Amino acid sequence: MNSKVLNTLEYQQVKQQLAPYLVSATGQQALNELHPMTSVADIQRALDETNDGAEVYRLKGGIPVARLADIKPHMKRLAIGATLNGSELGQVGRVLRTTRAITRFFAELLEDAPENDIRHLFDEVAELVTLPDVTKRLATAIEGDGHITDEASPELSRIRSNIRRTETEIRNQMGHYTRGHDAKYLSDPIITIRNDRYVIPVKAENRSRFGGIVHDQSASGQTLFIEPQAVMAMNDRLRQNQVAEKQEEQRILEELSNLIAPYQDEIINNAAILGHFDFINAKARYAHDMKATEPAVSPQNEVYLRQARHPLIDPRKVVANDISLGTDYQAMVITGPNTGGKTITLKTLGLLQLMAQSGLFIPVEAGSRVGVYNEIFADIGDEQSIEQNLSTFSSHMENIESFLAQIDAHSLVLVDELGAGTDPQEGAALAIAILDAIGAKGTQVVATTHYPELKAYGFNRPDTINASMEFDEETLKPTYRLLVGIPGRSNALDIAQRLGIPQAIVDQARSLTDTDSQDLNAMIADLVTKRKQVEDEQLHLKTQVADSEKLHRQLKSEFNAYQQRKDQLIEDAKVQANTIVEQSKTKADAIISDLRKKQLASGTATVKENELIDAKGALNALEQQPKLKKNRVLRRAKAQHDFHEGDDVLVKSYGQRGVLMRQMGKHEWEVQLGILKMKISDGDLERVKPEEPKRARATVQSAHASHVSPNLDLRGVRYEDAMTQVDRYIDAALLAGYPSVTIVHGKGTGALREGITNYLKSNRQVKSFHFAAPNHGGNGATEVQFK
């Protein structure tokens, strides 16, 4: 990608926004190397990595990468046999400890959420080498700031213990001078150090009162820093221990340097992976804070940005716009007055395309697509060079001339105020010729202009569409909303009239304007008004649909709760009834037992044994069975709704027979209807007797193939009715055995087309779908292939 367009579209400013999210030197290096890519595979991989990072951020708040310095220079020194200092070893140790922490983090993540697909990150984690023994040794010996710990070696611990003990002895001894009767002979009652030896500040005139050695004096000569005779031996011992400490520390540094030397490549690779994780972290957090989403990548350069926002404009002020290119048209001409937002729209398209090709999420709504351009060329009005002594027109022409020789079918051209800076008539003619030249090479182009002549261009040229920026006639201010399909209209006379210019002057100006221009402006104004009405109606319908769906969910939830409560009450009543029956049985058993005893005692048998058994059986029959298996009153009705896998059933709402595959909920079953599997409520099912196979096949063939058409025409049908028809039609077509069908929805506002597209995406029986060929309806019809 040429560097000029990166500057023009402010790509570097996006990188500057991303920089504060990084914590490692290697991550910063990855940001410095960030650039737009032109390979679909490379772009998709980078986007997948960002998506993985976003998923980890959602689950765990991000990958725990610590602040890491650049250790490559240390490894280069190590490679030539140098000994690393404490600070360098501390930084290497931090890399190894972070490596261990990251490995554990992903192991726990895999255990906690094995269903999450973040394979790109797991692949990189698998390349990390933890080196547990080396990590432990460095952690024990070196602190993060490079300080060598007492635990680095037993000898160092012993030496430092001697140093601390000797320092205590010296301070205790010298405390006699600073706190005793000799304190009055000192300049200050303190203990200090000169030439690595403990001394006291003595007034010069009292020199003779203290033995020892003078190590220094003050600038005025009034104070002498004397090492008293009493501590000289202790200072000597302290100094010897300090020398031994330095020698032991140097030995430890050499030992640790030799310890990590064989693992230079592994440590460098670990640092690179950690830096990459840091960069992925930064991309994910940046996307989260910017409310950005992952776009789909279109190798055919079919761009569709839903509610695109410029990332460098204050989120509280930025206006979102839908921008599309490459599907229904290859060129867009945005007309209208200045300061309406045309330039920002150009920059938004270009910058978001650069960001996506760099693997960054972009500030758009879900469902957006970006292209893959080998080059993007931009001629934006505010980047003209005055210091080169070029006029606006000349600068424009130089820019355009430079990219006309380079563009092809894989390029995107963005031109601001095409043909500006010269005679309007000639400028408009030149602009049309330039657009034709760009279109002849198959290059996609978005151009802005205020020339009215180019309004007709969008109507007359194939694969070209007009657009404009909306203007609020009430406030006399631009709204910065892009209106695709509507050319810009001149508002100068209306604005002048509203701002108080005398009516006579405005009327005279209108009379001087040719009739065609007035008619065109009136037509555009009418289009804008009707578009606004349609958008308002759409918004109203969406609100109604959302409210209806919410109400439906509430009613369904309440109905399910009612069903559960009803079932529970029935079960409770059965339990209570069974308790009563059980109590009665107990009493009856006692009575029968008593009767038997009396019969045996009297030797008579007035009540036969089989009669006793029958009476007891009748009592048992009173017990309420929870499953109703023995309740003769409800058994027949229950049998039709007692479902099991493999049962033949009738789906009442479709009038079709099917087979139960599996239970999916308390009141829902998966039913096989021909080649179609559907989730059906048990209230819509009735168990039936199996039919003969031949008879069943004949029923399917005759019931559907005879009256289901391979085409569904929805033109003129309201949105809600159309979506209902589509749902039923797809089911019927599948049952009829059609491999594919065509849905004719017309072009219109695109709302029905979008609704059908979303439905087909969510239908598991749909293999693929696409717009029909131009001679079969184009984007006014959708062809659907089934699995």
UniProtKB/Swiss-Prot annotation:
One GO BP annotation of this record: mismatch repair
Pfam families linked to this entry: MSSS, MutS_V, Smr
EC number: 3.1.-.-, 3.6.4.-
Record's signal peptide: none
SUPFAM superfamilies per the UniProt record, alphabetical: DNA repair protein MutS, domain III, P-loop containing nucleoside triphosphate hydrolases, SMR domain-like
Binding site for ATP: G336, P337, N338, T339, G340, G341, K342, T343
Domain Smr: 712-787
Nuclease among keywords: yes
Record key words, sorted: ATP-binding, DNA-binding, Endonuclease, Hydrolase, Nuclease, Nucleotide-binding, RNA-binding, rRNA-binding
GO molecular function, one term: endonuclease activity
Gene3D superfamilies with a match to the protein in the record: 1.10.1420.10, 3.30.1370.110, P-loop containing nucleotide triphosphate hydrolases
Organism superkingdom: Bacteria
InterPro entries in the cross-refs: DNA_mismatch_repair_MutS_C, DNA_mismatch_repair_MutS_core, DNA_mismatch_repair_MutS_sf, MSSS, MutS, MutS2, P-loop_NTPase, Smr_dom
NCBIfam families: mutS2
HAMAP family listed in its UniProt record: MutS2 (MF_00092)
Function of the protein: Endonuclease that is involved in the suppression of homologous recombination and thus may have a key role in the control of bacterial genetic diversity. Acts as a ribosome collision sensor, splitting the ribosome into its 2 subunits. Detects stalled/collided 70S ribosomes which it binds and splits by an ATP-hydrolysis driven conformational change. Acts upstream of the ribosome quality control system (RQC), a ribosome-associated complex that mediates the extraction of incompletely synthesized nascent chains from stalled ribosomes and their subsequent degradation. Probably generates substrates for RQC.
Family: Belongs to the DNA mismatch repair MutS family. MutS2 subfamily.
Subunit composition and interactions: Homodimer. Binds to stalled ribosomes, contacting rRNA.
Name by which UniProt lists this protein: Endonuclease MutS2
